[in-house]
């Protein structure tokens, strides 16, 4: 627009007129020329050419056309006027202002359009760059992910190969150990069989010699009778009298008797070696050296699979012993028949034979009882008839030459307990805890100075025999050996049958007393570690068809190494399929499952899993989850937290005995999530709900609990060795503290725990006037 303004030029009037005149002249010349040309065309068209005919229609049309030449001239004149240069018109100020505004607006709009196009171009450029950058980053992430997955896959493959190699190596070592153990046991059995055969052959030879001697004495009884009587009365031959000829045979019999005693001592050594292998830890503590027997005993503890082989070998030994016992009993019966058939036997010889019986090795317990017999025989060798056998002291038919004589008195311990150590070999330090069916003490082995836990079994009615509860506890705890279950070392006895103790490895803490002294609760990683160990122990019990039936925090032990162990098997028992009716009065009240509270008599492993859920909540909050004051209050507390069950969520709920008799208040909602809040994640709360499911058939098992995602999310479980340590309460002065309610007891007439501690037998606390122990710290033993 600026260029157009600059090209304008103001013309004068003369210039305008001249320009107009010049244009007019040009137009006239052009018109004249056009008319001339048109006349020439008309003249040419008026005269027909040769052979051309006139078209009247066309002529008429042209002549009568509305477009005349004058009109065309006028139109051309108007066009010429529009093309003519006119003088510039004067613009007013207002028009000029408006014109400038329009120009500015157009310029601004044009500039805005240019700026917008530039902005869009830059925006498209940035978007293309961002897209390219994102694509590059995405590609980079894909490559990094592929690289990471490849490295992780390689690492896992290496780890798997390493584990496979270790597993194969362990299997090879295990096979080698089993092979060595089998060879050793086979060698021991072979030696034992050879010894038994030698003893039985020796006994058979002695019986034959004795029968021959009896027959000979029957047919020629009168001649040698007076000298024997004179010798017994002290009127025998003189000191200088010659020794009679038959003295060689009794000397030979005496040598055979000494050989028999040596063979019996060898048998006793073999039985002692078997007892040592059965109590591996005690024998290793006594030896103190790395002998082969100690290594074999430790291997036996680690190998749980070898128990089946040992049981088979023991069955074979028992069968062999029964066969030999049968053969020996047959021989003894034949011998007795021969003795009865001798009608002419003298009355003196019959009285002698009535007091003496032949020894027949029947079982290991008989061989164990032979120790006391052999000791008394050695004591009796100082008598003239046994030890003072000189050349001048010959007795023809002395009873001392007969086979070994059985003692009429019982040994100090019963045969079933032969080989058990005495409790006197332990120094009791202090009392730790009262269990379901006994009292636990902390003691020290006097030989090895090891600290152990001694649990005295509660003998409910010892006059009626060994109590079934104690027998069940010993059998269960010996069967369920596992790293997360208390380890039994041996069984020791006191002076009487009512004093039987289980020797266990000493563990420093129980979770109940530990949580009461802790200033801060367990960390989430520590709770996961404890729960994993608890579930492993419970899984091992359930895999071996064992119900614990008394899981609670006071029965869970924690060592300084962070290893959790399940203890107190006083209420444990084996179960089978199909389920049988058991007593519902089991499990401590706070940890008792709802089916037990409502009177169900058929139950299974689900009762232990409910207790595990209660322990889980107590580990998180350091408080019992359902601390009821009575069974009814316990049921109400459970229903208030979890909601009242119905037949829909618990099939068979309405058929339970307590539900038929009572009506409970309705609690429609589960309020358990509010109780834990931030202490428990969503996965943890899901696991808690599965532990505390009403219907036992839907309650989670220990095996499935170990596979739950709660143990794989962050924070992960910590290593047990990273657990903090606390001072052991059992090693300090015992203080009274709040405990969970007592478990169900053994019924009417069941004596209170710890009553025997006040008697003169068993453990007794003896102190001086100043309060110090009279015989060192702790308890002293009295019997």
UniProtKB/Swiss-Prot annotation:
<dbReference type="GO" id="GO:0050684">
    <property type="term" value="P:regulation of mRNA processing"/>
</dbReference>
<keyword id="KW-0723">Serine/threonine-protein kinase</keyword>
<comment type="subunit">
    <text>The cleaved p110 isoform, p110C, binds to the serine/threonine kinase PAK1. The p58 isoform but not the p110 isoform or p110C interacts with CCND3. The p110 isoforms are found in large molecular weight complexes containing CCNL1 and SFRS7.</text>
</comment>
<dbReference type="GO" id="GO:0000278">
    <property type="term" value="P:mitotic cell cycle"/>
</dbReference>
<feature type="domain" description="Protein kinase">
    <location>
        <begin position="427"/>
        <end position="647"/>
    </location>
</feature>
<dbReference type="GO" id="GO:0005737">
    <property type="term" value="C:cytoplasm"/>
</dbReference>
<feature type="compositionally biased region" description="Low complexity">
    <location>
        <begin position="279"/>
        <end position="290"/>
    </location>
</feature>
<feature type="compositionally biased region" description="Basic and acidic residues">
    <location>
        <begin position="126"/>
        <end position="215"/>
    </location>
</feature>
<dbReference type="InterPro" id="IPR011009">
    <property type="entry name" value="Kinase-like_dom_sf"/>
</dbReference>
<comment type="function">
    <text>Appears to play multiple roles in cell cycle progression, cytokinesis and apoptosis. The p110 isoforms have been suggested to be involved in pre-mRNA splicing, potentially by phosphorylating the splicing protein SFRS7. The p58 isoform may act as a negative regulator of normal cell cycle progression.</text>
</comment>
<dbReference type="GO" id="GO:0042981">
    <property type="term" value="P:regulation of apoptotic process"/>
</dbReference>
<dbReference type="GO" id="GO:0006355">
    <property type="term" value="P:regulation of DNA-templated transcription"/>
</dbReference>
<feature type="modified residue" description="Phosphothreonine">
    <location>
        <position position="739"/>
    </location>
</feature>
<feature type="modified residue" description="Phosphoserine">
    <location>
        <position position="271"/>
    </location>
</feature>
<keyword id="KW-0539">Nucleus</keyword>
<dbReference type="GO" id="GO:0005634">
    <property type="term" value="C:nucleus"/>
</dbReference>
<feature type="binding site">
    <location>
        <begin position="432"/>
        <end position="440"/>
    </location>
    <ligand>
        <name>ATP</name>
    </ligand>
</feature>
<feature type="modified residue" description="Phosphoserine; by CDK7">
    <location>
        <position position="470"/>
    </location>
</feature>
<feature type="binding site">
    <location>
        <position position="455"/>
    </location>
    <ligand>
        <name>ATP</name>
    </ligand>
</feature>
<dbReference type="GO" id="GO:0001558">
    <property type="term" value="P:regulation of cell growth"/>
</dbReference>
<feature type="modified residue" description="Phosphothreonine">
    <location>
        <position position="583"/>
    </location>
</feature>
<dbReference type="GO" id="GO:0046605">
    <property type="term" value="P:regulation of centrosome cycle"/>
</dbReference>
<dbReference type="GO" id="GO:0005524">
    <property type="term" value="F:ATP binding"/>
</dbReference>
<dbReference type="GO" id="GO:0004672">
    <property type="term" value="F:protein kinase activity"/>
</dbReference>
<feature type="active site" description="Proton acceptor">
    <location>
        <position position="550"/>
    </location>
</feature>
<dbReference type="InterPro" id="IPR050108">
    <property type="entry name" value="CDK"/>
</dbReference>
<comment type="similarity">
    <text>Belongs to the protein kinase superfamily. CMGC Ser/Thr protein kinase family. CDC2/CDKX subfamily.</text>
</comment>
<keyword id="KW-0067">ATP-binding</keyword>
<feature type="compositionally biased region" description="Basic and acidic residues">
    <location>
        <begin position="226"/>
        <end position="241"/>
    </location>
</feature>
<dbReference type="GO" id="GO:0000307">
    <property type="term" value="C:cyclin-dependent protein kinase holoenzyme complex"/>
</dbReference>
<dbReference type="GO" id="GO:0006915">
    <property type="term" value="P:apoptotic process"/>
</dbReference>
<keyword id="KW-0547">Nucleotide-binding</keyword>
<feature type="modified residue" description="Phosphothreonine; by CDK7">
    <location>
        <position position="476"/>
    </location>
</feature>
<dbReference type="GO" id="GO:0004674">
    <property type="term" value="F:protein serine/threonine kinase activity"/>
</dbReference>
<keyword id="KW-0963">Cytoplasm</keyword>
<dbReference type="InterPro" id="IPR000719">
    <property type="entry name" value="Prot_kinase_dom"/>
</dbReference>
<keyword id="KW-0418">Kinase</keyword>
<feature type="modified residue" description="Phosphoserine">
    <location>
        <position position="577"/>
    </location>
</feature>
<keyword id="KW-0597">Phosphoprotein</keyword>
<feature type="modified residue" description="Phosphoserine">
    <location>
        <position position="47"/>
    </location>
</feature>
<feature type="modified residue" description="Phosphoserine">
    <location>
        <position position="72"/>
    </location>
</feature>
<keyword id="KW-0131">Cell cycle</keyword>
């Amino acid at each position: 627009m600026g260029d157009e303004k600059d090209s304008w030029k103001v013309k004068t009037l003369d210039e305008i007129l001249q320009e107009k005149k010049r244009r007019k002249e040009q137009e006239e010349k052009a018109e004249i020329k056009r008319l001339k040309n048109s006349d020439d065309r008309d003249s040419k068209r008026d005269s027909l050419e040769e052979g051309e005919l006139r078209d009247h229609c066309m002529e008429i049309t042209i002549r009568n056309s509305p477009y005349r030449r004058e009109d065309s001239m006028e139109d051309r004149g108007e066009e010429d006027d529009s093309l003519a240069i006119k003088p510039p018109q004067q613009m007013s100020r207002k028009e000029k202002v408006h014109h400038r505004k329009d120009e500015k607006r157009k310029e601004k709009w044009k500039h805005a359009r240019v700026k917008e196009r530039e902005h869009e171009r830059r925006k498209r450029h940035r978007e293309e760059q961002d897209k390219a950058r994102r694509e590059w980053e995405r590609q980079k992430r894909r490559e990094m992910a592929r690289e990471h997955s490849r490295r992780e896959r390689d690492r896992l493959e290496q780890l798997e190969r390493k584990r496979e190699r270790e597993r194969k190596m362990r299997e090879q070592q295990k096979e080698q150990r089993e092979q060595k153990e089998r060879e050793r046991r086979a060698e021991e059995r072979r030696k034992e069989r050879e010894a038994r055969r030698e003893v039985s052959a020796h006994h058979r030879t002695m019986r034959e010699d004795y029968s021959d001697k009896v027959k000979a004495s029957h047919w020629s009884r009168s001649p040698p009778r007076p000298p024997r009587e004179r010798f017994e009365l002290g009127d025998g031959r003189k000191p200088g009298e010659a020794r009679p000829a038959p003295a060689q045979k009794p000397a030979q019999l005496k040598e055979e008797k000494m050989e028999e005693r040596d063979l019996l001592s060898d048998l006793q050594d073999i039985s002692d070696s078997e007892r040592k292998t059965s109590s591996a830890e005690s024998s290793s503590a006594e030896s103190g050296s790395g002998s082969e027997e100690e290594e074999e005993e430790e291997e036996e503890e680690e190998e749980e699979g070898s128990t089946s082989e040992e049981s088979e070998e023991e069955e074979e030994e028992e069968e062999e012993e029964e066969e030999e016992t049968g053969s020996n009993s047959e021989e003894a019966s034949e011998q007795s028949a021969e003795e009865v058939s001798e009608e002419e036997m003298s009355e003196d010889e019959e009285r002698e034979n009535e007091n003496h019986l032949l020894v027949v090795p029947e079982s290991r317990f008989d061989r164990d009882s032979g120790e006391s017999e052999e000791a008394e025989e050695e004591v009796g060798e100082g008598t003239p008839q046994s030890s003072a056998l000189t050349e001048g002291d010959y007795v023809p038919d002395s009873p001392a030459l007969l086979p070994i004589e059985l003692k009429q008195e019982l040994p100090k311990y019963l045969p079933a307990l032969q080989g058990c150590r005495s409790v006197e070999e332990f120094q009791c330090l202090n009392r730790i805890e009262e269990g379901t069916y006994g009292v636990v003490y902390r003691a020290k082995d006097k030989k090895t100075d090891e600290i152990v836990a001694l649990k005295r079994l509660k003998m409910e009615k010892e006059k009626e025999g060994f109590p079934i509860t104690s027998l069940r506890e010993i059998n269960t705890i010996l069967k369920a050996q596992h790293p997360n279950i208390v380890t039994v070392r041996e069984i020791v006895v006191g002076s009487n049958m009512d004093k039987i103790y289980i020797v266990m490895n000493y563990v420093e803490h129980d979770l109940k007393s530990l949580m009461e002294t802790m200033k801060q609760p367990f960390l989430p990683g520590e709770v996961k570690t404890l729960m994993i160990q608890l579930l492993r122990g419970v899984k091992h019990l359930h895999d071996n068809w064992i119900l614990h039936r008394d899981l609670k925090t006071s029965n869970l032990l924690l060592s300084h190494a962070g290893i959790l162990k399940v203890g107190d098997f006083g209420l444990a028992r084996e179960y089978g399929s199909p389920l049988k009716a058991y007593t519902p009065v089991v499990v401590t009240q706070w940890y008792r499952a709802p089916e037990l509270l409502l009177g169900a008599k058929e139950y299974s492993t689900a009762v232990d899993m409910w207790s595990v859920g209660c322990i889980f909540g107590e580990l998180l909050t350091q408080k019992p989850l359902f601390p009821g004051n009575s069974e009814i209050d316990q049921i109400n507390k459970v229903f208030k937290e979890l909601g009242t069950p119905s037949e829909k969520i618990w099939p068979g709920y309405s058929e339970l005995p307590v539900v038929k008799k009572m009506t409970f208040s309705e609690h429609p909602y589960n309020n358990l999530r509010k109780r834990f809040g931030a202490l428990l994640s969503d996965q943890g709360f899901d696991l808690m709900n599965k532990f505390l499911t009403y219907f036992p058939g839907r309650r989670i098992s220990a095996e499935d609990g170990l596979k739950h995602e709660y143990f794989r999310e962050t924070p992960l479980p910590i290593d047990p060795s990273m657990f903090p340590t606390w001072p052991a309460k059992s090693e300090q002065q015992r203080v009274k503290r709040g405990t969970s309610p007592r478990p169900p007891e053994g019924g009417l007439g069941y004596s209170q725990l710890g009553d025997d501690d006040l008697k003169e037998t068993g453990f007794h606390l003896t102190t001086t006037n100043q309060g110090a122990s009279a015989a060192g710290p702790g308890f002293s033993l009295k019997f």
